Amino acid sequence: MQTPKREFLDHAMTERVCRRVEAGRGERNRRWLACWLGILLPFAWLWFCLIDNLSVEWASNPQYGYGWVVPVLCVGLICRRWNTLRAASSSGLDGRRPLSGKGGMVIVGAFILLALLYLPTRLIEGATPEWRIIQWSLGFETVGLTLCAIYLACGPLCLKRCLFPICFILIAIPWPTLIEAPVIQSLTRVNSRVVIELLSWLGIPAVQHGNLIEVNTGTIGIDEACSGMRSFQTSLMISLFFGEFYDMGRLRRLLLVPAGFILAMLLNVCRMSFLSIVAAKKGVAAIAQYHDPAGIMITLACTAGLWGLAALFNHGRIPAPGFLSPVEGRNEEVKNSKLRLPLLRRLGFALLLWLATVDAGAELWYRSLESHLAPGPKWSVVFPADNPTFKIVPISADTKNLLRFDEGKQGAWIDSDGSRWQAFYFNWRPGRVAGYLAKRHTPEICLPATGRELLSGPKLTLMNVKDVALPMRSYVFGTEGGPIYVFQCRWEGGAARNAYVEEESSRFNLIRGIWAGRGKKGQKVLEIVIARVNRPEQAEAAVARQLEKLVVVEEQ
């Protein structure tokens, strides 16, 4: 029998041992947390930069508004596969070091290459964040680095299971303009043509002008956000998601995509036909009442239809065999984690240091560059209100929502020589999205949608009006009533004269923005359309004379 003193000593010793164990456990937990923070933090920053870049497009362009749900769906797909991912991570390396064999070395080489490519991507993105090629580059780098890390951490089996959920974010990146523009025009024209036929069967007279439909009460503008392109992209996203959600085979997934596209096109034709009938019966202004509800209805109907179709395709399918259960692979997972963590920790901290250096360097570069840029003259546009033929043309709500300018106006008038004029003026105050929104639409994209044919242009002419350098790009479009001449100026505050280069939107000249600044000092767009003029030279001379009257320079 132990004495009270012995019992007291044993109890005190037990308490000291417990405190030491708890202290050691707390220290290990802190080290474990610091280790994984160092590994995960650079990838969290990469994904934040990608979503932050794309969020401007998602918020300002209805065509890509579905992008907001894509990151959520990516996380949902990963959570759905969580148990199989844990089992795959414990069995994927088979006890070997991640760098054993050529495959591991290739992955590490790809990891280093993608990390190095982040430097030019981030530098160019600072000047032209709206450039689709840069958005895709940032997307591939983010996805590629994440997949490389998953392979090194968990092995090839886990990489295979994570491949689709991680790559699914690419569906939310805007398509390159060279692909997007012709697809938009083609799908919208097909939709409009089908609607015209349906209206004729219903006894409603209608005429197609490019992407526009003219009925007896006016012209219906079927803009890009309401075209088949939006329906196609949304249906593609939904089809791919349900194919992965139900873990379908390749054939079923390939069948689901065109089936979704056909369903989306049919629903979009129904929507356009409904809006056209409303316009013919109640007037074009009545469309605003049904525009958004009709769009929401076809999106919900498309989602429900594809969900049902995916469930039908998956009916009676035998699930594919899974991986080891988490319990069976737990011991192997502990052994492999000891081999992976040192490598992942080194790569994670190296990547974190590299990303911080690149982003800090890019910010310092642009701040230093912009500190030497002059703000430029303050000018605005005053329309010829004293002309008896002048009238203010209201700006549609869709245009306001799409361009989101701070100041905008448009007007039309007839000059003394009989030429017809129409002018648009938009102003964006200094800010992050000023350059982004000002560069969005150009005449060669918008006017063909209204049935005009581009005959020539763009041709750059630098016009000096009251000591203000205006980079005018001229176009000639063919119409049923003869050619029209379009002059568009996108003026950027603080930009030097040599910053205005011909074919500014081309993929190579956009790199010049690295030396021109980020375009955050404000943007102005002035567009002038002239009709009933015989020659381009005559139109250019008339614009030069008219600009002297329209442009007003404020005293500084």
Where are these regions (language model features)?
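Hydrophobic N-terminal alpha-helices or hydrophobic patches in metabolic proteins across all domains
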Residues: 2-556
